[in-house]
Amino acid sequence: MLAQEVQQVLAAGTDDASACQISNMTAYEMEKGRKIVGLTKGATESFVVPRLSPLNSTGGEQWAFDGVSEDGVKSFMFGFYRDPNYSILGAGNFRLSLEFGFANRERVAELYYAERTVIETCPQGVRGVWYSESEGWHHSFLIKADMSEAVITLNSDSLKGTITYKSKSLPIAADGHVWPNGNATTEPVRYLHWSEPIPAGTVEFDVEIKGKKATWKGIGGHERFWTAFSWFTCLTNLQGLRAMAGPYVLSFFRFESGLDEGHVHQSAVLFKDGVQIFRSTLGAESDTEDYVLAQKTYGGAVTGDLKDKVTGFQVELVSPSKKQHYTFFIEHKNLAFEYLLGEGVGGSGFSAIAKGGHVGQLQYEGPSLTEALTFPKNSPLFKSNYV
């Protein structure tokens, strides 16, 4: 019954239900054998619609959401997966990871494996539902068609509530171009596609977590990943951050290829009052081209258990032609999530505070979230599935 109900939610709001497209899949449903499946590229189609159809044994996709409180100490990080590569960690292809960080440095992490996922694309937006009828839970996201707003709804025995987003930026592709753009790329490294439907915006968090109510305001963002092969195959590491300070929204991401040794793609974007004012993929100084210099910082108070004891970031955005120079310092305030993958490396995220602006002008302060992932060189769990 639930499957029919979730399919009707968006369709009921349009005059023409046939205008909606339904992607309805069960936990083990995918093509058998080495069959080529559809994987859409580029930045003309909506970033939030399904990009793999159907699933096969090598590819996958993720809808990722995060948020951090105004004081930089509370956080959440969610991953809605359609990805058979994660079946090694649980039952089926539909992993759902929900992680919460609290001001007292406690963390709560919950994992769900859905029996079915339904993604409904209608003229007014996209709704995705991950659910289990046998276990009696369902978690969902609803994203407006122009990707300016989103709502996450949580409904299980231990999690109940909503998280709402209102973007203060514009959707961007992997090279920082604003959607839609026929010349933009979503492929920072070979076979891995990435975009930010919401680089950053305001967040209102209202969730009951294991019987305790938590409400706060802050910022957050939404990312999309879709890959032809596993993350371990496509990547050796990634770094990323988002921040919102005064009128500014900053997004920075760096990807290092796992297939093409030495290939690194990074992208930095800056918005002011909702308008993109800076974009660059150049990571070295130049007298003529816009460039970004980003580096980890150390010596701060908050770090994790991984080998890399990073405590923040410094990001320099420079436009020689416009004679503009923006600097942002990000200092970690709390550990949002962390998982060890062996060899002292793994994935981690931090809630933080950013300070910065244009050099010589008024400086602003606001919440930020950083994340990093490094795969071990040798692991029985992570093997290349490139074919």
UniProtKB/Swiss-Prot annotation:
Keywords: Isomerase
Keyword Isomerase: yes
Induction: Expressed exclusively during fungal penetration of host leaves, the time point at which plant defense reactions are triggered.
Annotated EC: 5.5.1.-
GO molecular function, a single term: isomerase activity
Originating species: Pyricularia oryzae (strain 70-15 / ATCC MYA-4617 / FGSC 8958)
Pathway, per record: Secondary metabolite biosynthesis
The keyword NADP appears for this protein: no
Protein name stated in the entry: Diels-Alderase ORF3
Family: Belongs to the Diels-Alderase family.
Described purpose of this protein according to its UniProt entry: Diels-Alderase; part of the gene cluster that mediates the biosynthesis of a tyrosine-derived cytochalasan acting as a fungal signal recognized by resistant rice plants and leads to avirulence in Pi33 resistant rice cultivars. The first step in the pathway is catalyzed by the hybrid PKS-NRPS ACE1, assisted by the enoyl reductase RAP1, that are responsible for fusion of the tyrosine precursor and the polyketide backbone.
EC top class named in words: isomerase
InterPro entries: DA_C (IPR054499)
